[in-house]
Regions:
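Conserved N-terminal catalytic core of the sugar/cofactor nucleotidyltransferase
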Residues: 1-69
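A short acidic, often aromatic-flanked loop/helix-cap motif at beta-alpha or helix-coil junctions
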Residues: 49-53, 104-106, 187-189
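Conserved alpha/beta core of the MobA/IspD/sugar-nucleotide pyrophosphorylase nucleotidyltransferase superfamily
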Residues: 134-214
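Short beta-strand/turn micro-motifs composed of small residues
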Residues: 20, 73, 100-101
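Conserved beta-strand segments of alpha/beta enzyme cores
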Residues: 41-43, 124, 177-179
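Short, hinge-like loop/turn segments at secondary-structure boundaries
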Residues: 33-36, 61-63, 87-90, 114-119, ...
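Conserved core of the sugar-phosphate nucleotidyltransferase
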Residues: 79-159
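Short beta-strand-to-loop acidic/aromatic patch adjacent to the donor-nucleotide binding site
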Residues: 67-77
Length: 214
């Protein structure tokens, strides 16, 4: 969490909105202290029912932001170049731009938890989801979003979808407005279980010298 906030600020974010749910009071107290300590403007947005799909968190956060924004999964860590490049990816044909990694067999990717991405010839998204059998890349968990993303999630819910972020992404993909940015050789990690937590402790200081001061 703190790493992601510091990275977003270094990528140029003027304000960081953190969506809270489980143990919200404890997290919000930590965020207030971090804001004082770091000088970063941090605003919590609480989702009352944290059991709902993650698209509801996107809508809650987007409601507090005017215009485009970097969207990051709280348990992901990114090399600085990923977010800095992603912040520059906007364009009139894009409702969202997703950072993707074509190294789908990397030891840093958890195949049991990954969200897979199938691409069109122009690099825009054709399909996205955890259950894809044919895919070209893995979703890195970092997006440059426009207001269209939250609108797409809301529209998907109206049409009967559960309300996941991928529901909204697929809707934008179907409209030809879900772009991608290939991260190339850059480093990132989804810290969702103990072995990846150990990898993060081992590798993050090497890849994030601006945070760890090495």
């Amino acid at each position: 969490g703190e790493l992601g906030i510091r990275q977003a600020a270094r990528a140029g974010a003027g304000k960081v909105v953190v969506v809270t749910g489980h143990e919200a009071e404890r997290l919000e107290a930590f965020l207030a202290e971090l804001a004082r300590r770091s000088g970063i403007a941090i605003e919590p947005a609480r989702v009352a029912d944290w059991s709902v799909p993650n698209g509801y968190s996107v809508m809650a956060g987007a409601a507090r932001i005017a215009g485009d924004y970097l969207l990051m999964m709280a348990d992901h860590i990114f090399e600085a170049s990923i977010l800095q490049r992603l912040a520059q990816q906007g364009g009139p044909t894009r409702g969202v731009t997703l950072a993707i990694d074509r190294r789908v067999t990397s030891e840093l990717v958890d195949p049991d938890d990954a969200t897979w991405v199938a691409l069109r010839e122009d690099g825009f998204i054709r399909a996205i989801g955890k259950g894809l059998e044919a895919y070209d890349a893995v979703d890195c968990g970092a997006f440059l979003a426009t207001p269209q993303l939250a609108e797409a999630i809301e529209a998907a819910i109206r049409d009967g979808a559960p309300g996941s972020l991928s529901n909204g992404m697929q809707r934008l993909a179907d409209a030809g407005r879900a772009a991608t940015m290939d991260i190339g050789e850059a480093w990132w990690l989804d810290v969702d279980e103990p072995r990846f937590h150990a990898m993060a402790e081992d590798q993050a200081p090497l890849h994030l010298p601006e945070i760890f001061g090495s």
